[in-house]
UniProtKB/Swiss-Prot annotation:
Pfam families membership: EF-hand_7
Free-text function comment from the UniProt entry: Calmodulin mediates the control of a large number of enzymes, ion channels and other proteins by Ca(2+). Among the enzymes to be stimulated by the calmodulin-Ca(2+) complex are a number of protein kinases and phosphatases.
Note: This protein has four functional calcium-binding sites.
GO cellular component: myosin II complex
UniProt-listed InterPro entries: CALM/Myosin/TropC-like, EF-hand-dom_pair, EF_Hand_1_Ca_BS, EF_hand_dom
Record keywords, A-Z: Acetylation, Calcium, Metal-binding, Repeat
Binding-site positions, Ca(2+) 1: 21, 23, 25, 27, 32
Name of the protein described by the UniProt record: Calmodulin
Residues reported in the UniProt entry to bind Ca(2+) 3: 94, 96, 98, 105
Name of the gene: CMD1
Similarity comment: Belongs to the calmodulin family.
Organism: Phytophthora infestans (Potato late blight agent)
Binding site for Ca(2+) 2: 57, 59, 61, 63, 68
PANTHER family for the chain: CALMODULIN LIKE 3 (PTHR23048:SF0), MYOSIN LIGHT CHAIN 1, 3 (PTHR23048)
Length: 149
C-alpha cells in the first residue's frame, strides 16, 4: 500500500514522522503521540493512545517505526477524510469560532505542531487556500484544500 505513495508524499510523511518522534530515535511512543495530539487540542487517554499505536504496530513492539507510519498514512489517504473529520479539524484551527481561519490562528496551530513558519510562509498558505481573497480561510475553502491534497 505504501508503494503507491509519491516521493513527495513520502518526504512529507518523513517530516511529519520526525515531528512526532521527539527524541529522534526512529520510533513513536504513546508518550510522543500524546504530546502531538494534545498540541492539536485533543485529549486522548493512555488506552486510546495505545489502541492507536496497536492499530499500526505491525511487529508488535509497542511503538511505531517509519515503515509502519507510512502504511498508516497510505491507509488514511485511501479512505479520504470524512466531512465530519474535516469539520473537526476546521474547528481546531478556528480558535475563536468565528467560522474563519485567520493567519494568526494558522500560525498558532502550526507553531504548536513544531512547524516554525515565517510570516511569509503562513501568508502563502492562506493565499493558496483563500479562494474569495478575503485574507482568511472559510470552511468551504478549507474543505477544498483538504480534498485536494
Amino acid at each position: 500500500m505504501a508503494d503507491q505513495l509519491t516521493e513527495e508524499q513520502i518526504a512529507e510523511f518523513k517530516e511529519a514522522f520526525s515531528l512526532f518522534d521527539k527524541d529522534g530515535d526512529g520510533t513513536i511512543t504513546t508518550k510522543e503521540l500524546g504530546t502531538v495530539m494534545r498540541s492539536l487540542g485533543q485529549n486522548p487517554t493512555e488506552a486510546e493512545l495505545q489502541d492507536m499505536i496497536n492499530e499500526v504496530d505491525a511487529d508488535g513492539n509497542g511503538t511505531i517505526d517509519f515503515p509502519e507510519f507510512l502504511t498508516m498514512m497510505a491507509r488514511k489517504m485511501k479512505d479520504t477524510d470524512s466531512e465530519e473529520e474535516i469539520l473537526e479539524a476546521f474547528k481546531v484551527f478556528d480558535k475563536d469560532g468565528n467560522g474563519f481561519i485567520s493567519a494568526a490562528e494558522l500560525r498558532h496551530i502550526m507553531t504548536n505542531l513544531g512547524e516554525k513558519l515565517t510570516d511569509e510562509e503562513v501568508d502563502e498558505m492562506i493565499r493558496e487556500a483563500d479562494i474569495d481573497g478575503d485574507g482568511q480561510i472559510n470552511y468551504e475553502e478549507f474543505v477544498k484544500m483538504m480534498m485536494s491534497k
